[in-house]
Amino acid sequence: ANNNGVWLNVRRCNLFLDNIDKGTLSEEERNLLKGQVYFWRAWLYYRLVTTYGGVPIIKSAQNPTIGDGTIEESTLNVERSSTDDCVTFVCEDLDNAASLLPSVWADPSVNYGRVTKGAAMALKGRLLLFYASPLFNRSNDKARWDAAYTANKAAYDELTTNGDRELVGATSKRAQDWEKMFVNPLSKEAVLITLYNNISDDQFKFNNSWEQSARPKDIKGGGGIAATAEMVDLFPMADGKKPSESSLSYDPLKFYKDRDPRFYRTFAFNGVCWPYNTNKTYTVWNYQWFKDAAAAVEGKPGNSALYDGDVSSSIFVRKRTDPNAYNTSNLSSGVFSQSGSPYMEIRMAEVILNVAEAACGKGDNATALTFLKYIRERVGYTGDCGFSSTLAGDALMGAILYERQIELAYEGKRFDDMRRWLLWDDSFGTCTRLGVEPISGNQTRRHGIILAVKPELYTNSKAGKDCDPFNPEASEYLGTSDRTKISLDPDASDSDWENQIATLDNFYENNLNRVVNDQLDGTSTPT
């Protein structure tokens, strides 16, 4: 049997609940254990129901052998229950869990990371929000939105009043504390968290692989996670508006200018400082050059400042990486693999966004907008936070889903959001309602952004890694610009930041073109 199989784990939960009261543990001990098992059985069914709808409800461990040892099929073939009944069942388990679990566990040094009353209530809120969404609620039954709001608001109140949870981060520019929150195993933002360790011993290690995957190859990371042009161009400008709606000018080449503070903690790009433990001034360089000027015009992949060969994007995902990540050696691979950074499956920002969405769904626009502003205020926005005071109805719901896409980017939440809101195409009119482009058609094609050396700068026809046009350390340095004097540090003071931006602007304008790399057919087209 697959030890990670969902039905095997449901059986394990059922065996526990069937037998726990037969032991000699105290009632207090039994209740704490029951609360945790009710939660995890609910979690298993939550994943099943949100994926398949109705599934068989099995509340007690099945016995495949009856009497003489023959299999009694009538006890095993459990019919599929309705989605309604399954949602009710999961909510009952979560209510049971919430009634038995503490708001905060005693002795945090031993128990931190265990599920809590607030975590159970937050998962119930997430499930009921899913159930109120168009995937399961084609008729837009307002009663479901009411139930989702009640559950999510109750979770928010429990977590902030009794659970010692809060939105983490001062309102300083460029979201420095927001970045650090993701790698702090004791963060008060965490509601449901997976803890890892940085142990190297195979017998005891439980490492988070994200850091190794996200870091570039030149520092012996896994190669980096390429950010798409669609995501880079989607992030708000500094005024909170989409680039297409902002009063600030958006230059696709200088995509880093005047962006939402979270942009600088979500992406890493040419010329930006991306520190780790043993190199606090490490600067990303991942532009691309070609065999010669003709190849550059044709857009044929060439060489990268990062490493030989084609690259899918000059922009990496930075989010959830640790500025103090330990790099054991620049001479061997896997040096970031011993990461102990946690993963937050549910955090306070999601709970707040769930409250906002459910409030909007039930028609309470004022509450929805208030909670939506909480998300932006904690990263430095003030006043209207980029939202019109008259935002309401479908337009407000569209803004909430947009904020989810930004705040929760690269946290594994977008797929379910697209499913529950039927954003694949506009068959059910949700895309038109929300004012978003359907995912189908050309939207399924994801494009990389390659920053390529301008063709007119080529003075020879060499293509090797030692012919880097901007690196004085290269043996055949072209001398057109010196990149070693450039580093855009998101932690810099405001005055230094402005000077660094101006220097980077000059480098981009004089040396680089933005090239669209089509991930479907492998072509690169200059823009």
Q: What spans do the regions from the language model cover?
A:
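An aromatic- and glycine-enriched ligand-binding surface/loop that stacks and positions planar moieties
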Residues: 1, 55, 59, 95, ...
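Conserved, well-structured interaction surfaces
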Residues: 1-53, 74-88, 92-110, 251-257, ...
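Extended, compositionally biased alpha-helical segments that mediate assembly or anchoring
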Residues: 462-527
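C-terminal substrate/ligand-recognition segments
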Residues: 256-375
